[in-house]
């Protein structure tokens, strides 16, 4: 058995840009996706192992929904892709997902992306 520290390195293509949500391989689910984007007061959870496309999928959805009249905020650790027109909060040693989510809820958000929900407090607020 090995002991000690581990490191994870993620390499993202910097010049790739954000992919169109409908080019990601969900052809049968396109109408379901469009309907889910129109729902108010709902939560969508995307869960998958590392490297399975969660970030690509989430940013594609945000890009699809990103319009000046929609207040979109992300809470991430770290912010992986900077997106014009979206408010992005990066978690650090002085902030948490829960405290940031509480703050964002007071700012009349239309859409909130919470990058991780790993504790009961964040789960209850979401």
Where are these regions (language model features)?
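Flexible, glycine-rich phosphate/dinucleotide-binding loops
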Residues: 81
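Conserved glycine(s) of the Walker
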Residues: 53
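Short glycine-rich substrate-engagement loop in P-loop NTPases that contacts/grips substrate
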Residues: 88-104
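P-loop NTP-binding catalytic core
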Residues: 1-48, 60-73, 84-87, 91
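Generic hydrophobic/aromatic pocket-lining and core-packing "Φ" positions
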Residues: 33, 62, 101, 123-126
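Amphipathic alpha-helical segments that mediate coupling or scaffolding at interfaces
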Residues: 61-64, 94, 104-107, 116
């Amino acid at each position: 058995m090995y002991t000690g520290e581990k490191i994870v390195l993620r390499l993202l293509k910097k010049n790739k840009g954000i992919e169109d949500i409908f080019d990601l391989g969900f052809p049968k689910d396109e109408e379901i996706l469009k309907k889910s984007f129109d729902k108010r007061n709902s939560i969508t959870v995307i869960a998958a192992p590392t490297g399975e496309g969660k970030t690509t999928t989430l940013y594609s959805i945000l890009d699809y929904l990103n319009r000046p009249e929609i207040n979109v905020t992300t809470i991430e650790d770290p912010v992986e892709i900077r997106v014009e027109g979206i408010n992005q909060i990066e978690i650090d040693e002085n902030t948490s997902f829960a405290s940031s989510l509480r703050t964002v809820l007071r700012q009349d958000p239309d859409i909130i992306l919470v990058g991780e929900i790993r504790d009961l407090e964040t789960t209850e607020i979401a």
